[in-house]
Amino acid sequence: MDNQAVSALWSCASATCLSLDAKRHSIEPNPDGQASPDVNNNNNNHNKSTTTVDAHSRKLRHIAHTPRGSCFMALLLLLLLALNFRHAHSCGPGRGLGRRRERNLFPLVLKQTVPNLSEYHNSASGPLEGAIQRDSPKFKNLVLNYNRDIEFRDEEGTGADRVMSKRCREKLNMLAYSVMNEWPGVRLRVTESWDEDRQHGQESLHYEGRAVTIATSDHDQSKYGMLARLAVEAGFDWVSYVSRRHIYCSVKSDSSPSISHMHGCFTPESTALLESGAEKALGELAIGDRVLSMDVKGQPVYSEVILFMDRNLEQVENFVQLHTDGGAVLTVTPAHLISVWQPERQTLNFIFADRVEELDYVLVRDATGELQPQRVLRLGSVQSRGVVAPLTREGTIVVNSVAASCYAVISSQSLAHWGLAPMRLLSTLQSWMPAKGQLRTAQDKSTPKDATAQQQNGLHWYANALYKVKDYVLPKSWRHD
């Protein structure tokens, strides 16, 4: 519709609205109950048309004052207003639902490996652990991959190409998703996975289910350089564009200390400050305890523990230790978020524990009860038994007097806090249920308070779901890999 037509419609609409408004006001009574002078003059001069005017007035009053009439006029004006706007084309999210790339991806070149290290280096896929046969005790640790988006060649006819380690399956499924987004209609093809016939070299991770040889279902060799790059982005620990006919990828062992616990936790011996003023070990915390936390402004507040993201008192893990100049010591897993104060910018950020550096500032509770910056003097690592990850309503917790996040793996505190909003809502709804509250009161009288926490052993189901989804929706730079 051109501008002249729109202007004409606007003029008609304005005239109609003004006419209806004038007629509506002309028949409204004055505050003293008298009719307006215009109506009196009209009645004196046109007595014969009184009946017609009254009927018309009632009709106008009905149109002007009923909700149906008001809605009709509003819709008419909105329609005319919409016609005055020109349509615009917006950019869509691209093919599929995959995460957007932050940078351009460059294909690998023939014979290139990422990282440029030996495959058995600790920073790559790590050392060999020994071949696995069907009758080996470790064979039960391998898994089958039935992903329908992956084409398995299976030359042997035994299904061996579907057998692999858990980490290898995770990365392979992620790569299959990326391949479908990169080339619609093309699937990832696995030509070799676990090898029980020892058809490779003496030292091969194929024998452990930690390596795969891949290609594309259309056998288009021009895609293989980009396929190798996608494998790197998917998280394979070592990728080699070894041949023009295929790509070789391998991963760390599932029992590798560097990946044995990818979530964020504290040690059970670490303590939190209760609202009563008493200190309590994290291994003894219970849902409903109110512990010292930190609000969005960096001020100390007490917040309720609503669940445990993870809790396993027997698992042995590697931890990072932060020592401050005030004597505080925080022991936490490398992927956990720690609050770091930047005095130059006067801002508070959250970074992964293994990326905190000496001379950084962390917030520590002082003798007055306030959270004050203290310098990190020394960093170390320690191996300890047990992991505990309480989640408070604030999303933060002060452990061993050091302010830390309740979240890990994801670099954004606000995004992680938003992701746990359903659990906070569920906790609130449960607190409003009298029956549940009465049941909890009855249980508190008959059982120790920490029985609630002891019922959980392992990763919380909702946290586990978020950890699995993150690889598909978040950029790699946002994750602790």
Curated annotation (Swiss-Prot):
Localisation per UniProt entry: Nucleus; Cytoplasm
Protein name per UniProt: Protein hedgehog
Subunit structure of this chain's protein: Interacts with shf.
Residues carrying the site annotation Cleavage: G264, C265
Region of interest (Disordered), residue spans: 26-56
Lipid linkage positions (Cholesterol glycine ester): G264
A GO biological-process term: segment polarity determination
